[in-house]
């Protein structure tokens, strides 16, 4: 019996060793990759942008025709129903975001994803968005079912809007592991729409290879967005309030919305009556570590401004003529600490994968070498026999 369990022939031992090394080199790296591939449960990710010089409008005061509250010293700002730029505040702005994941009890192939994003002027919250999705852990796309929830709140005016049990398409915070050099549908939380985020180039951040993606949304009407989605009132603690489509449009003489240069550009007289509404546009540059699909850097150039229609909004953006009518505008990038934290998060995984690549290559090389040695031993024994 021992004869069969413990082969005495050196040739047999060489063959066994070759098989072991080949199995190690072939099986172990993919096993680790498959283990780290799905979106992990129990993530708790905090990101914050570096304080960025930006502008925001006291829109409620402007719409109500109240005394100008902005930081402009223009004499016109002392007038009743002052021009729109008299309500602008120039501040250091930041965006904070917390994103968490959790398991879905009924299906371990899915994960809950929840996020809270807050826009701050100093310590003062200007707006916040909460979002809930159920994601496929392999693709990081939301499931094809009405599982999503979204809420937008303006704390200063104690109002907002919410959506529940709707279906969305496109990734948002998580890219799939094994990110490819191609375009992906990207869901924008502010506009509630999905458009392509496009691969642009590769680069290294602190020695880690990353893929760069660019996402751009042409100016779109937030009034149209509000009209095209089904929303619910927001219970802000002092009663349920909801932004309606009519709340997004305001009217008045052109001189209240456009200075002389802008009126010349748009062909308007000071007394022409105009109706304007908020338009939103954003350009994003995203850096992704492709093995894990982890976002390691994000820059967003956000503009929300008043314009009469889509054509005028496009003209204003093309001529960089949006600031005086800005509801919000800032070019924001993750802080150095946030980028370092995200890179530190992926660094151990990258090191392990690189080590396993060496193990895989070495295991296969040793296994092949041992098989060649076994073949030589067999041929020599055959000749001697």
Can you say where each PLM-predicted feature lies in the sequence?
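Proline-rich low-complexity regions
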Residues: 36-40, 174-176, 253-262
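Short N-terminal edge-element motif at the start of the domain
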Residues: 157-192
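N-terminal short leaders/motifs
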Residues: 144-161, 233-248
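Juxtamembrane interface at the cytosolic side of transmembrane helices
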Residues: 2-15, 29-31, 351-385
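Extended interaction regions within the primary functional domain
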Residues: 88, 218-219, 357
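Membrane-proximal extracellular "stem/stalk" segments
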Residues: 267-359, 371
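Solvent-exposed N-terminal domain segments of exported/luminal and surface proteins
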Residues: 2-158
């Amino acid at each position: 019996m021992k004869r069969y369990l413990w082969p005495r022939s050196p040739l047999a031992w060489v063959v066994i060793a070759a098989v072991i090394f080949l199995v190690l080199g072939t099986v172990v790296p993919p096993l680790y990759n498959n283990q780290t591939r799905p979106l992990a449960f129990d993530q708790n990710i905090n990101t914050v942008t570096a304080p960025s010089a930006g502008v925001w409008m006291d829109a409620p005061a402007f719409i109500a025709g109240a005394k100008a509250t902005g930081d402009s010293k223009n004499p016109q700002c002392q007038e009743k129903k002052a021009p729109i730029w008299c309500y602008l505040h120039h501040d250091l702005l930041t965006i904070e975001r917390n994103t968490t994941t959790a398991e879905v009890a009924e299906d371990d192939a899915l994960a809950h994803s929840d996020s809270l994003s807050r826009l701050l002027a100093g310590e003062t919250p200007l707006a916040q968005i909460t979002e809930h999705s159920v994601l496929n852990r392999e693709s990081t796309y939301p499931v094809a079912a009405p599982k999503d929830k979204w809420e937008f709140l303006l704390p200063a005016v104690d109002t907002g809007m919410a959506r529940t049990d709707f279906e969305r398409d496109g990734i948002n915070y998580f890219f799939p592991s094994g990110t490819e050099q191609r375009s992906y549908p990207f869901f924008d939380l502010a506009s509630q729409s999905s458009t392509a985020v496009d691969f642009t180039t590769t680069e290294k951040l602190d020695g880690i290879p990353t893929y760069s993606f660019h996402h751009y949304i042409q100016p779109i009407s937030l009034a149209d967005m509000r009209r095209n989605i089904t929303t619910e009132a927001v219970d802000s603690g002092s009663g349920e309030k909801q932004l309606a489509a009519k709340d997004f449009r305001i009217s008045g003489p052109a001189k209240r919305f456009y200075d002389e240069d802008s009126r010349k550009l748009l062909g308007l007289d000071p007394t022409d009556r105009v109706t304007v509404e908020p338009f939103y546009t954003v350009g994003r540059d995203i850096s992704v570590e492709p093995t894990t699909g982890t976002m390691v850097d994000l820059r967003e150039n956000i503009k929300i401004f008043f314009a009469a229609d889509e054509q005028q909004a496009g003209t204003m953006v093309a001529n960089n003529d949006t600031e005086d009518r800005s509801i919000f505008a800032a070019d924001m990038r993750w802080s150095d600490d946030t980028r370092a934290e995200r890179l530190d998060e992926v660094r151990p995984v990258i090191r392990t994968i690189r080590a396993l690549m060496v193990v895989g290559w070495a295991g296969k090389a040793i296994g092949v070498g041992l098989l060649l040695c076994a073949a030589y031993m067999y041929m020599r024994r055959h000749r001697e026999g």
